Curated annotation (Swiss-Prot):
SMART domains: CA. Residues 712-795 are cytoplasmic. It comes from Pan troglodytes. Coiled coil: none annotated. This is Protocadherin beta-12. The keyword Disulfide bond does not apply. It is a single-pass type I membrane protein. The gene is PCDHB12.
Length: 795
């Protein structure tokens, strides 16, 4: 009985839902299928494709699936063949109770585009239940004066089957007093009445009994039996009469248990026990017996179980009043259940797609259906989502909704959405239901790697070891997964003369930069190149950055003395007159340093001297000057060692050796002016005289006298011959060139300081530059020396 009541409740819900469905789906295609109950799971129901006129391939490509209203999966669809199969054994009595026909409604959900097709599955009854009497023994008390053809009620049998398989007829054992007559009640169920064929005589037969048999219409038919005992009583010739033949009442579905529904009342004209009335439900269904209770004495009908308008909207109850003599009267009570807003909306999810790509608008995220079991405004619903999210709800047929993206999403801004779908009814008070989903956004390669800096400046000391880590670059990608994996590379240099591949390398995984070989500041002070960062997306995205490498100078070059040149040939001798004043400029030590900056700042100091204190060296310019007055006691020859030191760390140095000759009566040298042409002519005559004198080697004494005379004559003349110094001619080594322009000399010089011989005019050359520039291409050329010349005084 309980299963039957639940089935009736479900059937009423299904019928109500599909009445609304039929109104909203007018004109849509419907597939009708028929199946017998109790078939095994996997049994063939029908071919959906043929019934609806669809292609089998369309079912598979559009992801067709069967969706039921109560979320039960009774059917399954084979998308490869289009066949509908049973997912479970169907029990018609459990599904529909006593309702006939038993029709189940399903929808076929198809995507791209979203479409709903209706399926009606009629479950046909089989004769799997026998009629059953609730009371195995019935007791009837019949007055002896009951007229022939008097009718007496018998309890009906219950058969869960319907249609032809339900109870069809009743029979009793053949006897001379009674026969059975079959009646049909308002709900089309048959019940038996016992008809008196022959008057009863209490004195002759006070009691008799027979078997009541109920037969259904199945093949073969099933039956059930009960024992009927008839007790003959004395005369009771008045039946009870109700005050109203029909009662109609209304009751709210949320009424509390024990509430009084209605009171029925009847009377009997008899007296004594024959007028004592007893109220009962006549042939009431199980739902009625579970929900209501009648007081047999007072006729009060009270509520014993909760009401549910959505399950049963009304009850029709036959009330029987029976007197003490067995006579009865009947009345009908109709109880109308009034709906209250006691059901919150329901959400049934059909499909959810997560994660979804970030760059695809109008993507269907979720398909769901809403419903409210209430009626009227209580069953009207409003569906909504928060306004601050890029999603939109679109309604479809039969209260189906789709949740779609409103615009392209950006995973880098937000990778996850927690969406709350709220369904609110319009009843009083309003009830709502919320459904939360978490939606993940999958990454699309829409962000190129970004360097932390647009340009990088790296510093590297020269003379580095190969494979030295000189710095790192870094780029980040806002994407995720393989789209965020960055690979670094060197880009082709725009300078065709820069051998970038032999200078640096880069680790493709972490961006570490390495120097491939040792660098020389004097050859390469700086260079720049571009690096690229590419991700692993499809298509791959990339970006570039500029890298500048500045080579830092190391103190790896010692000072080089340009003058006096230390080449192992005849030493350079400087002549100083004994009459020179303190601070007299003897000579200037000229040196350069191939380094730059502080490493090329040179300082000079006198390291050794034949006579300390006689000469001094200026620290910043290398000038060698006399420190005091010269005297006759000072030696004629002096050897000076000048130390040239740079300002590097550690400092490097070089030495220059000078020979100084003190000469008596030696005037200051000067360069002849253009107006001194007559004096030059005298110098030429004197040269001829000296050559002749030197050719005369008659005696050493004569040579000494002539030498003394020559010296005297030189003092008087304006010619300014000085000592001889042989310096090589030709280019200097190219590594002495200050390539950066920041060295000690911006231009390198070679000096020639001697008196030329073999010339008709005694031309005196003093610190004349003979090499204007040091060129890099002269590196490694040999140094040539001019043969020493002697002036006509023999120095």
């Amino acid at each position: 009985m309980e299963n039957g009541g639940a089935g009736t409740l479900q059937i009423r819900q299904v019928l109500l839902f599909f009445v609304l469905l039929g109104m909203s789906q007018a004109g849509s295609e419907t597939g009708n299928f028929l199946v017998m109950e109790e078939l095994q799971s996997g049994s063939f129901v029908g071919n959906l494709a043929k019934t609806l006129g669809l292609e089998v391939s369309e079912l598979s490509s559009r992801g067709a699936r069967v969706v039921s209203n109560d979320n039960k999966e009774c059917l399954q669809l084979d998308t490869n063949t289009g066949d509908l199969l049973l997912s479970e054994m169907l029990d018609r009595e459990e599904l529909c109770g006593s309702n006939e026909p038993c029709v189940l409604y399903f929808q076929v959900l198809m995507k791209n585009p979203t479409q709903f097709l209706q399926i009606e599955l009629q479950v046909r009854d089989i004769n799997d239940h026998s009629p059953v009497f609730l009371e195995k023994e019935m007791l009837l008390e019949i007055p002896e004066n009951s007229p022939v053809a008097a009718v007496f009620l018998l309890e009906s049998a219950k058969d869960l089957d319907v249609g032809i398989n339900a109870v069809k007829s009743y029979t009793i054992n053949p006897n001379s007093h009674f026969h059975v007559k079959i009646r049909v009640n308002p709900d089309n169920r048959k019940y038996p009445e016992l008809v008196l064929d022959k008057a009863l005589d209490y004195e002759e037969l006070p009691e008799l009994s027979f078997i009541l048999t109920a037969l259904d219409g199945g093949s073969p038919p099933r039956s059930g039996t009960a024992l009927v005992r008839v007790v003959v009583v004395d005369i009771n010739d008045n039946s009870p009469e109700f005050e109203q033949a029909f009662y109609e009442v209304k009751i709210l579905e949320n009424s509390i248990l024990g509430s009084l529904v209605v009171t029925v009342s009847a009377w009997d004209l008899d007296s004594g026990t024959n007028s004592e009335l007893s109220y009962t439900f006549s042939h009431a269904s199980e739902d009625i017996r579970k929900t209501f209770e009648i007081n047999q004495k007072s006729g009060d009908i009270t509520l014993t179980a909760p009401l549910d308008f959505e399950a049963i909207e009304s009850y029709s109850i036959i009330i029987q009043a029976t007197d003490g003599g067995g006579l009865f009267g009947k009345s009908t009570v109709r109880i109308q259940v009034m709906d209250v807003n006691d059901n919150a909306p329901e959400i049934t999810v059909s499909s959810i797609t997560s994660p979804i790509p970030e760059n695809t608008p109008e993507t269907v995220v979720m398909v769901f259906r809403i419903r409210d079991r209430d009626s009227g405004d209580n069953g009207k619903m409003v569906c909504s989502i928060p306004e601050d999210i890029p999603f939109v709800l679109k309604s479809s047929v039969n209260n189906y909704y789709t949740l779609e993206t409103e615009r392209p999403l950006d995973r880098e801004s937000r990778a996850e959405y927690n969406i709350t779908i709220t369904v609110t009814d319009l009843g009083t008070p309003r009830l709502k239901t919320e459904h939360n989903i978490t939606l993940l956004i999958s990454d699309v390669n829409d962000n190129a790697p970004a360097f932390t800096q647009t340009s990088y400046t790296l510093f590297l000391c020269e003379n580095n070891s190969p494979a030295l880590h000189i710095g790192s670059i870094s780029a980040t990608d806002r994407d995720s997964g393989t789209n965020a994996q960055v690979t670094y590379s060197l880009l082709r240099s725009q300078d065709p003369h820069l051998p970038l591949a032999s200078l640096v390398s880069i680790n493709a995984d972490n961006g570490h930069l390495f120097a491939l070989r040792s660098l020389d500041y004097e050859a390469l002070q700086a260079f720049e190149f571009r690096v690229g960062a590419s991700d692993h997306g499809s298509p791959a995205l990339s970006s570039e950055a500029l890298v500048r490498v500045l080579v830092l100078d190391a103190n790896d070059n010692s000072p080089f003395v340009l003058y006096p040149l230390q080449n192992g040939s005849a030493p350079c001798t400087e002549l100083v007159p004994r009459a020179a004043e303190p601070g007299y400029l003897v000579t200037k030590v000229v040196a350069v340093d191939g380094d730059s900056g502080q490493n090329a700042w040179l300082s000079y100091q006198l390291l050794k001297a034949t006579e300390p204190g006689l000469f001094g060296v200026w620290a910043h310019n290398g000038e060698v000057r006399t420190a005091r007055l010269l005297s006759e006691r000072d030696a004629a020859k002096h050897r000076l060692v000048v130390l040239v030191k740079d300002n590097g760390e550690p400092p490097r140095s070089a030495t220059a050796t000078l020979h100084v000759l003190l000469v008596d009566g030696f005037s200051q040298p000067y360069l002849p002016l253009p107006e001194a042409a007559p004096a030059q002519a005298q110098a030429d005559s004197l040269t001829v005289y000296l050559v002749v004198a030197l050719a005369s080697v008659s005696s050493l004494f004569l040579f000494s006298v002539l030498l003394f005379v020559a010296v005297r004559l030189c003092r008087r003349s304006r010619a300014a011959p000085v000592g001889r110094c042989s310096v090589p001619e030709g280019p200097f080594p190219g590594h002495l060139v200050d390539v950066s322009g920041t060295g000690t000399l911006s231009q390198s010089y070679q000096y020639e300081m001697c008196v030329t011989g073999g010339s008709r005019s005694n031309e005196f050359k003093f610190l004349k530059p003979i090499i204007p520039n040091f060129l890099p291409q002269s590196t490694g050329s040999e140094v040539e020396e001019n043969p020493p010349y002697q002036n006509n005084l023999g120095f």
